[in-house]
């Protein structure tokens, strides 16, 4: 009775959401109860892969060695997790729906990231092409720009959101072995499949947006060359319908519908062969005026929300943003600026909790003990006089952090 009454009070959106979740959980439970033989027969595996999996299953039935049995079982379970034939579709049939998708894409990028007008325009063009020909072969993309200037956000909130596909990230920084990407051969002990197959399993579709971060940081060695060769193969439209993971060497995996995106800072460090395959989107270094806007309108609201402040409880005055920039090393992005804001807001959060404790007459000894952990004496004295909502000014920031001893933001962490 209570359940029916609760359901009647739900919005249509929530009812549909709960129905989808329940159906997915029941379907997963049913799949786990279906014998492997029938899961192979009912799977979307290509005929050749299906035949190979059935042969493996027949071998499994007569294996006596428990180690080999477990390994072959893992192989079969892994193959059945690859989402063969499943694609995320975002149909926009009418002209109006396509225009709305483009407008939503631009609005989402503007909401999440400031500036980068040329890069945003390039992304809108790319999305337009996909809307015009949704079954076409997607272009591989290279997004260039300095560290911390918003490349990942552009891809996640721009391209992946516009295409309505899962966003999967693979970090290439320092990667020195192609087996991390393509797996180990089945014959090796404790071998498994590689990260590329992993992201397909996690995305549960064969056309996710796969974002390779720090392409220019791949190891400069023979092993690094093997990684680049694998990436060239994966982005080659004449070959990527037949990708082979080392663990599933007999199974052909079609990567032709995957949207591959690579980010890098140094264009000269990229293999010319791979670079030639990429549609390049360039992002620029952020200017001080841009950083001030980003700090007050983008970074502070995000940091404050993550730490637990209400949206209107903290505001950064323009002069305070300029002061903060003067206290950190010159950078082309905003990573250090974000770290500085995080430290300040964390300190403010502790002071806010102590302020509330004072009003509730918490033991002075307890409050004093926590105040002793705040290493900035001026900040500790502010605890009793801060009131929220609060506007951060240069004078307040000077009291919240230690005086600048050197051209480094590290003073904020002492």
Predicted segments with their positions:
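Conserved C-terminal "switch" segment of AAA+ ATPases
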Residues: 42-49, 204, 266-276, 280-342, ...
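Walker A/P-loop
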Residues: 132, 136-172, 201-202, 232, ...
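AAA+/SF3 P-loop NTPase mechanochemical coupling elements
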Residues: 203-208, 243-263, 315-316
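Conserved catalytic/switch belt of AAA+ P-loop NTPases
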Residues: 212-253, 276
